[in-house]
């Protein structure tokens, strides 16, 4: 029998926020602006990066974002999952 997941919506929201904080921290450490990162992953506006980093308007990074951001920042995608 397969175990049911015990993560609540609040748990998942905390995970999204942690990932956003980690992306922001690493981006800032690398000296890359939100605009430059947005353009590097194929977006024309900082809104996607800004909202996802702060988990605003129910926005969060998806796996495609994270793969592209890791590539642009030159880090391993697992670095975004620290402290989860």
Over which residues does each language-model region extend?
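Short C-terminal boundary/hinge segments that cap the last helix of small helical domains
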Residues: 63, 72-84
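Short alpha-helical "recognition helix" segments of helix-turn-helix
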Residues: 36-39, 69
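Conserved hydrophobic/aromatic packing and binding residues within compact polymer-binding modules
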Residues: 23, 37-38, 49-53, 80
């Amino acid at each position: 029998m397969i175990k049911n997941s015990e993560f609540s919506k609040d748990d998942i929201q905390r995970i999204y926020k942690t990932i956003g904080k980690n992306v922001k921290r690493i981006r800032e450490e690398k000296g890359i602006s939100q605009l430059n990162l947005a353009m590097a992953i194929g977006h024309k506006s900082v809104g996607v990066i800004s909202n996802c980093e702060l988990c605003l308007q129910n926005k969060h990074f998806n796996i495609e974002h994270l793969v592209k951001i890791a590539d642009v920042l030159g880090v391993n995608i697992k670095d975004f999952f620290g402290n989860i």
